[in-house]
C-alpha cells in the first residue's frame, strides 16, 4: 500500500516539474480514440519536441494545485490528456487543434500559455497562427517589396536620363 502511495506522490512531483518547465500546456478530452490514432498523435508531437501524458484526474488536480494553476482543477473530470512543450509555444496547440479537426472525439478544453491559464478561445487563436517559418517569410517579403519598387523606379530613371 505504501509503495502505491509513493508512486502516486512521485507521479505528482514529476508532473509538477513538467508543468513548471512548460511554455505551453494543452488539456484535451478524448473518448473512444483508437490506439493507432494516439500513436500517430504522439509521433507528430515528438517531431515538434512536445510530449503527451495521460494521468489520473486526481494526480492532475494535485499537480495543478502545486503549480498554482487552480483554474484548471475543474476541468479534470472524465478522460483528459495533457500535451506540453518546454521549448515551443505554438506547436502543442497547433498539433492538437489539427488532430481535433480530423477526429471529433478530441476536444481541446483549456491550457496554460506562458504560466497563465488560457481559455479555449486563446488556445484556438494560438493554434491558428502561422508557423515561425511562414511568419519570417511574410516579414522578409514585406521588407523586400518597397526595396524592389525603389529599385524599379531607379532603373526607370536611369533609362529616362539616357
Swiss-Prot record:
Single GO molecular function: large ribosomal subunit rRNA binding
KW rRNA-binding (keyword) present: yes
InterPro entries: Ribosomal_uL10 (IPR001790), Ribosomal_uL10-like_sf (IPR043141), Ribosomal_uL10_bac (IPR022973), Ribosomal_uL10_bac_type (IPR047865)
Protein name in UniProt: Large ribosomal subunit protein uL10
GO CC aspect terms: ribonucleoprotein complex; ribosome
Role this protein plays: Forms part of the ribosomal stalk, playing a central role in the interaction of the ribosome with GTP-bound translation factors.
Keyword presence, Transferase: no
Residues making up the signal peptide according to the UniProt record: none
Family (UniProt): Belongs to the universal ribosomal protein uL10 family.
SUPFAM superfamilies listed in its UniProt record: Ribosomal protein L10-like
Organism: Phytoplasma mali (strain AT)
Subunit structure of this chain's protein: Part of the ribosomal stalk of the 50S ribosomal subunit. The N-terminus interacts with L11 and the large rRNA to form the base of the stalk. The C-terminus forms an elongated spine to which L12 dimers bind in a sequential fashion forming a multimeric L10(L12)X complex.
Gene Ontology biological process terms, A to Z: translation
The entry's keywords: Ribonucleoprotein, Ribosomal protein, RNA-binding, rRNA-binding
